[in-house]
């Protein structure tokens, strides 16, 4: 594991895991790193947030070793976002985030005596299951890929939530070097 990966996937880190199995392709499940593992087997031990152990105690969270290549940091979420037709999104469905495409935008207008509000729901098509399902904006996020330590496409700074750990303060402004007499 490289130095950056050690930081992203240290004990207690919130992560997402994909499974390359039939019925799970194109989905990501959130979990917490319980234990990092040596370089030789490139696996880490995860406790999943929404997946349950397949035993008589169905309320116990699933815990298992997963390949490091199937793990990424928790995907970023924008504070507020609307989506357009053909946007590639992740929709929270069946306990995980599933990749799909927005196929319809349904606008809702709500009126009462004091004010008027509007909201939207989105119809999303999932290639993997050939299903089309309607979602509220809060259950969608822009689809992003984790590529060598960077999210693609990148977050728009004004729309993103602040990081979970505080960022270091910016460095003090550099002073110009003193003028030299020639």
Q: What is each residue range found by the language model?
A:
Residues 1-182:
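Eukaryotic chromatin- and chromosome-associated nuclear factors
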């Amino acid at each position: 594991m490289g130095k950056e990966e050690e930081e992203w996937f240290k004990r207690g880190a919130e992560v997402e895991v994909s499974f390359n199995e039939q019925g799970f392709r194109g989905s990501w499940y959130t979990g917490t790193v319980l234990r990092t593992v040596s370089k030789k087997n490139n696996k880490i031990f995860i406790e999943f947030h929404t997946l349950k152990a397949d035993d008589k105690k169905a309320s116990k969270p699933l815990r298992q070793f997963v390949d490091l290549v199937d793990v990424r940091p928790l995907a970023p979420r924008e504070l507020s976002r609307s989506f357009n037709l053909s946007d590639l999104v992740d929709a929270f469905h069946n306990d995980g985030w599933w990749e799909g495409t927005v196929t319809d935008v349904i606008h809702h207008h709500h009126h009462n005596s004091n004010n008027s509000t509007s909201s939207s729901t989105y119809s999303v098509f999932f290639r993997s299951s050939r299903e089309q399902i309607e979602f509220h904006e809060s259950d969608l996020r822009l689809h992003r890929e984790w590529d060598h330590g960077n999210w693609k496409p990148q977050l728009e700074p004004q729309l993103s939530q602040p990081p979970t750990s505080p960022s270091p303060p910016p460095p003090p402004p550099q002073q110009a070097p003193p003028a030299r007499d020639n």
